[in-house]
From Swiss-Prot:
Record organism: Trichlorobacter lovleyi (strain ATCC BAA-1151 / DSM 17278 / SZ)
GO molecular function, one term: ATP binding
Induction conditions: By stress conditions e.g. heat shock.
Name this protein carries in UniProt: Chaperone protein DnaK
PROSITE patterns: HSP70_1, HSP70_2, HSP70_3
PANTHER family noted in UniProt: HEAT SHOCK PROTEIN 70KDA (PTHR19375)
Entry similarity comment: Belongs to the heat shock protein 70 family.
Biased composition (Basic and acidic residues): 622-639
Domain of life: Bacteria
Protein purpose: Acts as a chaperone.
Keywords on record: ATP-binding, Chaperone, Nucleotide-binding, Phosphoprotein, Stress response
Gene3D superfamilies cross-referenced by the UniProt entry: 1.20.1270.10, 3.30.420.40, Actin, Chain A, domain 4, Substrate Binding Domain Of DNAk, Chain A, domain 1
In-chain residues carrying the UniProt-annotated modification Phosphothreonine: 198
InterPro entries: ATPase_NBD, Chaperone_DnaK, Heat_shock_70_CS, HSP70_C_sf, HSP70_peptide-bd_sf, Hsp_70_fam
Length: 639
């Protein structure tokens, strides 16, 4: 069995880890970084670029550079969270036929799982380059508070990327696994995970290799992106006050503001004040305009005060659901890049009444935990048991539009639960099962996961038929529901893919598209390598022609020059084979040059042309006769 990789598919950055020699290690990407920006760009030439390369060109290509796509995954277009994103996004977010939020880039629509798959492919390739072998099995992390459709969409992304997703694991649980793997004592810990786009808090009990999640809570639309947006709005408002120009209407300027905001936020974690300098940010009739502002840490904290206040509620709820007080929690583990912000650390300290533990790398710990879980599933890591929970209650709609819960939130998974219901009317031939997820009392206020019908119920007075509804949640937190007429034994089931999820046909098509793109990428890489080789061949041959061209036959020299011209003609070709063929032909023709150079080297002064004296070799270590060497005796004077 090949290696199982652990991938932290983050909103802002992604990371990949594996178990090697019994230890989890984070793998650096081709640029040498241990984290990769979760960005995908589509260039004018039709090329797809990922990670740091995509981030570098974002300012000049804002409409076709996708970021924070995780905030759209598994979400409907009509939700408030998506509407909020549409208002500030430089790229187009559109409504798909199934009601999902998709993106439109260069007149082509893409689903969030499809874009996430491109990022996952980059992480897969990073691992493959390091291991020197093909990787197919993976553990992928998701925010603990992701609902069923978001989990399913993440699993779909893995499939599109050509991965066999062995397990979807919650990010705080993965972090706890990385933190507690070598801990021997029993501990109650809280994992506070504030990343680029999501916020989770989980309370766990650790001991004897058992990691038991007691409760989880969070907000899947709160993270570093929101803090950045506060700074962007402040910069735009200040510039408008000063210059009378609203930069929000200029997508290129807005992208520069985004980069500056992120940089300023990071700098203010280590200093009390930072400068924001953006020359030539825009122009009007009077000429170019420059932006120069100072932002203090105190100002940043006041701008983000409402976001900082939002952190307390989920923490209090998680502790209450776990049946613990703040004083009973032994350690608070900080996860996610946003936990570097001093105001966040201070807020955590106030909520839990203790200094949080900074012993783990907040950017890498989730991927490390996923890598460990991969080792557990493969059998490389022994004596580790992970008991996770479902973050939200699950149930069905019953008479009067009420949500009847079958599985309460924070129930340990995998789990299975059944309940018997009946008909609401006489001679009812079918029942419609409306599956929901959430904590509100009325069905309409919760998230619909799916609908299905159980038909063929024999005529009977209301309340007589016995319909058994069973909920089954697997270890990935993905829901399966079945309904059975106990009278006839007739059964109908549904594997929840969410009413807005991708169909099997759509996923299969996206898998094929991803495979064809991978083949295209390989072809492009081979062409670039062939071009580089050809370029090197042309350079060395032309150099040799200058040096010894007069030593070869004029006809042969003409042949070589023709072959150089032929190779230059095909250099721009996308076909690696054509370039290689022309390179080989030039190499063959250039053999005569190599012979001439060798002959010239043989005749050069100092070469092995010493005639009869060659037999009289100098002894090893002897000095040449013309060197001024003085031989002298010495006498040791004893004191």
């Amino acid at each position: 069995m090949s290696k199982v990789i652990g991938i932290d598919l983050g909103t802002t950055n992604s990371c990949v880890a594996i178990m090697e020699g019994g230890e989890p290690i984070v793998i650096a990407n081709s640029e040498g970084s241990r984290t990769t920006p979760s960005m995908v760009a589509f260039t004018e030439a039709g090329e797809r670029i990922v990670g740091q390369q995509a981030k570098r060109q974002a300012v000049t290509n804002p409409e076709n550079t996708l970021f924070a796509i995780k905030r759209l995954i598994g979400r409907k277009f009509e939700t408030e969270a998506v509407k909020k994103d549409i208002a500030i996004s430089p790229f187009k977010i559109v409504k798909a036929d199934n009601g999902d939020a998709w993106v439109d880039v260069r007149d082509k629509k893409y689903s969030p799982p499809e874009i996430s798959a491109i990022i996952l492919q980059k992480m897969k390739k990073t691992a493959e380059d390091y291991l020197g072998e093909t990787v197919t099995d993976a553990v992928i992390t998701v925010p603990a508070y992701f609902d069923d459709s978001q989990r399913q969409a993440t699993k779909d992304a893995g499939k599109i990327a050509g991965l066999n997703v062995l397990r979807i694991i919650n990010e705080p649980t993965a972090a706890a696994l990385a933190y507690g793997l070598d801990k021997k004592k029993d501990e109650k810990i809280a994992v506070f995970d504030l990343g680029g786009g999501t916020f989770d808090v989980s309370v766990l009990e650790l001991g004897d290799g058992v990691f038991e999640v007691k409760s989880t809570n969070g907000d899947t639309f709160l993270g570093g992106e929101d803090f950045d947006q506060k700074i962007i709005d402040w910069i735009a408002d200040e510039f408008k006050k000063d210059q009378g120009i609203d930069l929000r209407g200029d997508k290129m300027a807005l992208q520069r503001l985004k980069e500056a905001a992120e940089k300023a936020k990071c700098e203010l974690s280590g200093s009390m004040e930072t400068d924001i300098n953006l020359p030539f940010i825009t122009a009007d009739a009077s000429g170019p305009k420059h932006l120069n502002l100072k932002l203090s840490r105190a100002k940043l904290e006041s701008l983000c005060d409402d976001l900082l206040r939002k952190l307390e509620g989920p923490c209090r709820t998680a502790m209450k659901d776990a049946g613990l007080t703040a004083s009973e929690i032994d350690e608070v583990i900080l996860v996610g890049g946003m936990t570097r912000m001093p105001a966040v650390v201070q807020r955590v300290q106030e909520i839990f009444g203790k200094v949080p533990n900074k012993g783990v790398n907040p950017d890498e710990v989730v991927a490390i935990g996923a890598g460990i879980q991969g080792g557990v599933l493969k059998g490389d890591v022994k004596d580790v048991l992970l008991l996770d929970v479902t973050p939200l209650s699950l149930g069905i709609e019953t008479l009067g539009g009420v949500l009847t819960r079958l599985i309460e939130k924070n129930t340990t998974i995998p789990c299975r639960k059944s309940q018997t219901f009946s008909t609401a009317a006489d001679n009812q031939p079918a029942v419609s099962i409306h599956v929901l997820q959430g904590e509100r009392e009325m069905a309409r206020d919760n998230k619909t996961l799916g609908n299905f019908e159980l038909t063929g119920i024999p005529p009977a007075p209301r309340g007589v038929p016995q319909i058994e509804v069973t909920f089954d949640i697997d270890a990935n937190g993905i829901v399966h529901v079945s309904a059975k007429d106990l009278g006839t034994g007739k059964e109908q089931s549904i594997r929840i893919t969410a009413s807005s999820g991708l169909s099997k046909e759509e996923i299969d098509k996206m898998v094929k598209d991803a495979e064809s793109h991978a083949a295209e990428d390989k072809k492009k890489r081979e062409a670039i390598e062939a071009r580089n080789q050809a370029d090197s061949m042309i350079y060395s041959t032309e150099k040799s022609l200058k040096e010894v061209g007069d030593k070869v036959d004029a006809v042969e020299k003409g042949t070589i020059e023709n072959k150089i011209a032929d190779l230059k003609k095909v250099m721009d070709s996308d076909d690696a084979e054509v370039i290689k063929k022309a390179t080989d032909e030039l190499a063959q023709a250039a053999h005569k040059l190599a012979e001439a150079m060798y002959a010239q080297a043989q005749q050069a002064p100092g070469a092995d042309s010493c005639g009869g004296d060659c037999g009289q070799q100098q002894e090893a270590g002897a000095k040449p006769k013309d060197e001024k060497v003085v031989d002298a005796d010495f006498e040791e004077v004893k004191k």
